[in-house]
């Protein structure tokens, strides 16, 4: 299990997030100073949605086979009364990945706030300058090692490619195709599985080339 190096002289004065933050590290130990830094970064995002009660922050050291180098991935999921909003990024360090993930999450939260304003009759979008200030990131980085798989006896086994490594379950709240496209954009995915309230069937919207979308329905 790897650890994060810390500069004892680093001082962070930003306020902490009011929402609960749940951290999950895959093959990396997340120290307290990094948790505090993340909390301070996320505190700036709560103004876009005051109903946010939980941030899920996941750090993962993965192997980028195309570039043949190690990749540090950070995924941040914001949960509130509205749709789930997510930002994720991959970089050569966890700090760099965090910065990119926060930028993506901020953009999607701002988009959701603008949509709510228009829906409730307030046509004035949030100012871009309001959210441009960023907190300088420490120069310290993670020292990581490739992920290892274990069998039931605890022995290390080599993980082969082409396997299902993650399974997720989501509530199937009926929604329109437009709402499904909106939620797909908020989580930053190329597809979105949903229950179509018009056809009462499971359906999938997906991103095509040239900013177009596709729709798959079960017969």
UniProtKB/Swiss-Prot annotation:
Offer one example of a GO biological process linked to this entry. Answer: negative regulation of translational elongation
Q: Which UniProt keywords apply?
A: Cytoplasm, Translation regulation
Identify the Pfam families for this entry.
Answer: Ribosom_S30AE_C, Ribosomal_S30AE
Is Cell division among this UniProt entry's keywords?
Answer: no
Check the record and name the Gene3D superfamilies matching this protein: Ribosome hibernation promotion factor-like (3.30.160.100), Sigma 54 modulation/S30EA ribosomal protein, C-terminal domain (3.30.505.50)
Identify the InterPro entries for this entry. Answer: HPF/YfiA_ribosome-assoc, HPF_long/plastid, RHF-like, RHF/RaiA, Ribosom_S30AE_C, Ribosom_S30AE_C_sf
A single GO CC term, please?
cytosolic small ribosomal subunit
GO-annotated molecular function? ribosomal small subunit binding
Give the location in the cell. Answer: Cytoplasm
Has UniProt tagged this entry with the keyword Nucleus? no
Describe the protein's quaternary organization and the partners it interacts with: Interacts with 100S ribosomes.
State its role.
Required for dimerization of active 70S ribosomes into 100S ribosomes in stationary phase; 100S ribosomes are translationally inactive and sometimes present during exponential growth.
> Which PANTHER family does this entry report, sorted A to Z?
30S RIBOSOMAL PROTEIN (PTHR33231:SF1)
Q: Which HAMAP family match?
A: HPF (MF_00839)
Name the record gives this protein: Ribosome hibernation promotion factor
In its UniProt entry, the species of origin is given as Mycobacterium tuberculosis (strain ATCC 25618 / H37Rv)
């Amino acid at each position: 299990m790897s650890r994060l190096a810390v500069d004892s002289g680093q001082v962070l004065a930003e306020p902490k997030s009011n929402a609960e933050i749940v951290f999950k590290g895959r093959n990396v130990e997340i120290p307290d100073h990094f948790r505090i830094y993340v909390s301070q970064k996320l505190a700036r995002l709560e103004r876009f949605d005051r109903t946010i009660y939980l941030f899920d922050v996941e750090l993962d050291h993965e192997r980028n086979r195309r570039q043949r180098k190690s990749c540090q991935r950070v995924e941040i999921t914001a949960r509130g009364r509205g749709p789930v909003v997510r930002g994720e990024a991959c970089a050569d360090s966890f700090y760099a990945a965090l910065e990119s993930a926060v930028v993506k999450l901020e953009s999607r939260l701002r988009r959701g706030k603008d949509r709510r304003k228009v829906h409730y009759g307030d046509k004035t979008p949030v100012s871009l300058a309001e959210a441009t200030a960023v907190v300088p990131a420490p120069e310290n980085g993670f020292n990581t090692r490739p992920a290892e798989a274990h069998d039931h006896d605890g022995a290390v086994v080599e993980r082969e490619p082409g396997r299902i490594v993650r399974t997720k379950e989501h509530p199937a709240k009926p929604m329109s195709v437009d709402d499904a496209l909106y939620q797909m954009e908020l989580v930053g995915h190329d597809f979105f599985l949903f229950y179509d309230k018009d056809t009462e069937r499971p359906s999938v919207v997906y991103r095509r080339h040239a900013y177009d979308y596709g729709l798959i329905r079960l017969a």
